[in-house]
Amino acid sequence: MPRPGRPTTERAKDFKGTLRQIIRTMSHYKLPLAAAMLFAVLSTIFNIAGPKVLAKATTALATGWIARLRGTGSIDFVYIGRILLFLLGMYLLSSAFSFIQGWLMTGLSQKVCYDFRRQISEKINRLPLAYFEKRTVGEVLSRITNDVDTLGQSLNQSITQLITSVTTMIGVLVMMLSISPRMTLIALLILPVSLALVLVVVKFSQKYFKAQQATLGVVNGQVEEVYAGHNVVKAFNRETVVLADFNAANDKLYESAWKSQFLSGLMMPIMNFVGNLGYVAVAIVGSIFAANGVITIGDIQAFIQYVKNFTQPIQQLSQVSNMLQSMAAAAERVFEFLNEPEEEQLADPAHRADPADIDGQVTFDHVRFGYTPDKTVIHDFSCTVQPGQKVAIVGPTGAGKTTMVKLLMRFYDVDSGSITLNGHDVRDFDRSALREGFGMVLQDTWLFKGTIMENIRYGRLDATDEEVIAAAKAANADHFIRTLPGGYQMELNEDASNVSQGQKQLLTIARTILADNRILILDEATSSVDTRTEQRIQTAMDRLMEGRTSFVIAHRLSTIRDADLILVMRDGDIVEQGTHDQLIEAGGFYADLYNSQFEDVVD
């Protein structure tokens, strides 16, 4: 089993470029974002004003207490009570605004995730087949699930904390200056130290956050791959090899994850230590000023609170930097996916062909193709197939049989030459219209989680129940379906393991029959079923192929003896063509293949 590709480097991402893309994306949500920012600012302002208001109560309490001790007055509890009620109202408003801001921001972040998932889902349908053949399923799924979730969670928390932290820093600075500029200067001395420490930690943690996200996709790919091929792994006793591969990827994920989390975790204790130093310095200087009557006791209490509040946003900004790193790492992978080159879905309007013109005539004219420029798979393929003919393509593994089908359906485009349908180049059809003309039965059957009725109806979504049942009967599938619990309403599980391989192929054939396409492609359709089921499939397909152009790709040469035309491929070229009898009589490469299979059966 091939291993998924592993990241080869831990170099730093384009952090600034990714943030610019995120900002451009957020510009589509200006109104809810602006509202969330406004309520965040209002909530923070009321919180900031709290210590200053409370200082008046503290000063009134201290003054009244001293006056009471001296016998010159008493504590004005009515005045203090009014202040506390006013303070309570401010904090209630702050909480209300914070709640509204949280509600808006949560909805906004989930809307962003929703839109990203929708864009990814639409993008998948526009990506060329080559993209998926070069990547594991787990890696693609990781971008849709892990990366989008990480992006949404980080977006929700980072924007809120960024706004409140900046607002708090500015507001607290203003309040501190209004109390004592000299004490403010002392408190500000901690800023350069704090910022320097944040920048150092961010610099070292940045590359590990990207490596963590990338390696997580690799681990997901391995888990998905091993789960899908679990039976193969156990049959070949490859558990040890698979475990070793997984451990290698898991170790790499562990290394990048613990380093990124450890470095980000250093910020809080470092910032707390620096903040406490400033707190102690302000407390000492403030007590000296109070003793000399420069400021009141209430102002000292408020200023100390502000110093504590001033260091908190710095700590929060350090956390925001970590969240931004995680968000940018996830966003970069999402944007990379969304920026992948797409297939051209629509043909040139000046030469667009009408899919109604497809009646089954297919011409390959000196087709040349390679998956990479330095590796040509098909060298010079030419052939004309008339409507209604059954064409068999045979040859050893790697001869280019399946590649011809991919070219016919424009999963890939030819490097030179052309493929035409009724004289129209396949590139003159819209891709969706072109593929609607083909019905496929693949060796790797695909059924989704749902009822048997729904799986067959996938061939034509507007088909009635009667039409679905008729298609199942034509595919010789009706009998076994009715013997299953629930019949046509039986629910298939995610990998359709509650029906046999032969039954899966009969269901896919029924789906193809229901689609009623003009051209059929049978790729190894009967290579993995028992003889009795193969006979049922062959009978159903013979009925289906009447009046339709059919391409049959098979290694069992006995299944295509009645083909109107047999194309024998070898190393990307057609070396022989003709009927079965003609090719046997010629005694060439086809005859050798046929006789070797016959000898294997006899042996």
What are these regions (language model features)?
Residues 15-30, 140:
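A short amphipathic helical element positioned immediately N-terminal to and/or at the very start
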Residues 28, 32-45, 157-211, 282-295, ...:
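Transmembrane helices of ABC transporter permease
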Residues 41-49, 91-99, 151-154, 158-170, ...:
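Hydrophobic alpha-helical transmembrane bundles that constitute the permease/transmembrane domains
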Residues 64, 175-189, 259-333, 337-338:
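Helix-loop-helix
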Residues 7-15, 38-39, 46-62, 66, ...:
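Juxtamembrane helix-loop junctions of ABC transporter transmembrane domains
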Residues 28, 129-130, 148-155, 159, ...:
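An intracellular "coupling" helix at the cytosolic face of ABC transporter transmembrane type-1 domains
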Residues 33-97, 178-182, 293-297:
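Transmembrane helix-loop-helix hairpins at lipid-water interfaces of multipass membrane proteins
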Residues 346, 355-603:
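ABC-type nucleotide-binding domain
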